[in-house]
Amino acid sequence: MPQSHIPVMLNEMLANLAPKDGEFYLDCTFGAGGYSKAILESCDCYITALDRDPNVIKKAEEIKQNYGERFDFIETNFADSFAKLKEKKFDGVVLDLGVSSMQLDIADRGFSFLHDGPLDMRMSGQGLSAEEFVNIAEEKELADVIYKYGDESFSRRIAKRIVEYRKTTRIDSTGKLAQIVRSSIGFRKGKIDPATKTFQAIRIYINNELGELERFLANVKNILKKDGRLVVVSFHSLEDRIVKNFFKENSEKPVARSKYAKDDIAIDPDKWLKIITNKALATSDKEVGLNIRARSAKLRAAKKIL
């Protein structure tokens, strides 16, 4: 049975975004609308939501009917959104980088190893599909992608098995790919499904998720108002590292000064962020018990000070 969509780290997101009446917020990853709806319900504010997945438009229309002019939706990838936002500025920006339950549970989207369907994995439906990639990529490229984006220690073994399998049969379904991976590794008691890391790796690669996160962060300063907050929920160590490093590189490191020092320290204009979360927040055991898909989530938040 499909799992209903449960927004991850919802309370932590609201606490760090701190929505207020009359303010404007940007939900960069609308999905099933969990974050947008929660922010709209928290106060009398306004939301612009983004998503490149055309399948979420119906859900966006439902929220629009309920909240009217307080809600606006733009069908676009967040990394390409700046021109479409037309110089709007926001009091807060939130990104939930995980694939939504809605995408995972629809077999035809090709994201899930639990539901057999066409091997697609494209969030926008455009560009190279997972089926095309696994059937044309060289063995070394397959291994590198699975290792880099999935942190899969058996990546070479899996890549070799994929290449052997496709010599006689095209890999055109999620079920076939999942079985190839499982047969390469074998099930280990008490561990996650062996196909988890490989599917994650191919999805991240196909959708250029890390590159688009970096591209968005490089421009987010331009759409945040002074004191505006940036909240990012990630599900992969590489995503979290990108966000962590971005916050660190753009924030002022606290300086220990003598109480006798009289001169003021000039503010570095390149250090425009103040980190709110000293370290990444993780999901509680209670939340993971209710939603196993939240187990790897991490939240970081920062505020624009210049």
UniProtKB/Swiss-Prot annotation:
Database matches in SUPFAM superfamilies: Putative methyltransferase TM0872, insert domain, S-adenosyl-L-methionine-dependent methyltransferases
Source organism superkingdom: Bacteria
Cellular location(s): Cytoplasm
Enzyme Commission number(s): 2.1.1.199
InterPro entries in UniProt: RsmH, SAM-dep_MeTrfase_MraW_recog, SAM-dependent_MTases_sf
Pfam families: Methyltransf_5
UniProt KW keywords: Cytoplasm, Methyltransferase, rRNA processing, S-adenosyl-L-methionine, Transferase
Keyword Glycoprotein among record annotations: no
GO molecular function: rRNA (cytosine-N4-)-methyltransferase activity
Gene Ontology biological process terms from the UniProt entry: rRNA base methylation
Residues the record lists as binding S-adenosyl-L-methionine: 33-35, 51, 78, 96, 103
Cellular compartments per GO CC: cytoplasm
Gene3D superfamilies hit by this protein: Putative methyltransferase TM0872, insert domain, Vaccinia Virus protein VP39
Catalytic function, reaction form: cytidine(1402) in 16S rRNA + S-adenosyl-L-methionine = N(4)-methylcytidine(1402) in 16S rRNA + S-adenosyl-L-homocysteine + H(+)
PANTHER family, per the entry: 12S RRNA N4-METHYLCYTIDINE METHYLTRANSFERASE (PTHR11265:SF0), S-ADENOSYL-METHYLTRANSFERASE MRAW (PTHR11265)
Function: Specifically methylates the N4 position of cytidine in position 1402 (C1402) of 16S rRNA.
The family this protein is said to belong to: Belongs to the methyltransferase superfamily. RsmH family.
Protein name as it appears in the record: Ribosomal RNA small subunit methyltransferase H
